[in-house]
């Protein structure tokens, strides 16, 4: 699909033009402070390129799930500060999304100025299931660009959503894929097209149901499919193991049995786990074999034997895609499995493998555990979007650019 890109827009010329950029600035906050600025950092190159060429940039983004109403705790104010720091220029925050203040500020922009709109999800039309409501909101966003405006889609973490500021607005303005979206698509096409073998995929996270589509899509294509995290316990139960009080999707056991029957030679499961008495960072815990989980205890990480086995598989890989932690990495006692897998991927990358971290919790884990982000070939900013792409689904926010 031929999609116009940021390079095309810059070649056409942006000096004096209002350019609406949909960025993904949905960062985690704790007490109003940004705890992981990864997505903000990833948005900077596209914004910088436009500003340097004299564009009048208007940024649309969301934060959290405010349910279509104003929530001061989900204001983009901390994000405006973080952008200003990184761009080394003032980034004013509009007091609304498409209201009087946004219009006034947008009209007052000079060449090379930037404006951040307030959280687009403060307006219920952004995420409405009613296409006419979304179209109405998209038209209001487009109006902010005055005459000769343009739209740049640069929020890869939201391109799988059919939302007003992602999808509908692209129908109202000349539209382009931003540098980040272009780079993300290029990387994912590389791992989904003809990846160099052996190709190993690591999937973690809590629910099998969330990853079923990607398991079905990837299992026939990969050499090894490593499964850890909370979702592994439903697979282990399907093998007949008693998983104690571990996270279990009973309605998915038969599905896991079927997957193991079809792809048992590809799927790699843990052989030991770190079990805990309860779900807390200070819980009593120990590494045990699969038949030794104490009654009522729950597995909160893969065990050391499994970590070594997973690392051995990854050591032979030439292409690696990783999405989802191996355990509750937020608790130090249950972070070892995730760290071991991440370090094995870094080692494989150093030996020449092409590695992609599929956004979401995996990217957060890399940063939380203090690992070198440059040790991976690519860290995606979009967990859900990258999974849907690998499932073979169309991404509405990309398709609409074509």
From Swiss-Prot:
* Record field: catalytic activity: (2R)-3-phosphoglycerate + ATP = (2R)-3-phospho-glyceroyl phosphate + ADP
Looking at the Swiss-Prot or TrEMBL record, what is one Pfam family this protein matches? PGK
Instruction: Output the GO biological process annotations, alphabetical, semicolon-separated.
Output: gluconeogenesis; glycolytic process
As given in the record, the signal peptide range reads none
GO CC, sorted alphabetically, is: cytosol
Principal EC category: transferase
SUPFAM superfamilies annotated for this entry? Phosphoglycerate kinase (SSF53748)
UniProt binding sites for substrate: 24-26, 39, 62-65, 121, 161
Q: What InterPro entries does this protein's entry cite?
A: Phosphoglycerate_kinase, Phosphoglycerate_kinase_CS, Phosphoglycerate_kinase_N, Phosphoglycerate_kinase_sf
Q: In which pathway does it act?
A: Carbohydrate degradation; glycolysis; pyruvate from D-glyceraldehyde 3-phosphate: step 2/5
What subcellular compartments does it reside in?
A: Cytoplasm
Q: Residues that bind ATP, according to the entry? A: 211, 299, 330, 359-362
Its Enzyme Commission number(s) read 2.7.2.3
Matching entries from CDD domains are given as: Phosphoglycerate_kinase
The entry's family comment says: Belongs to the phosphoglycerate kinase family.
Identify this protein by name.
Phosphoglycerate kinase
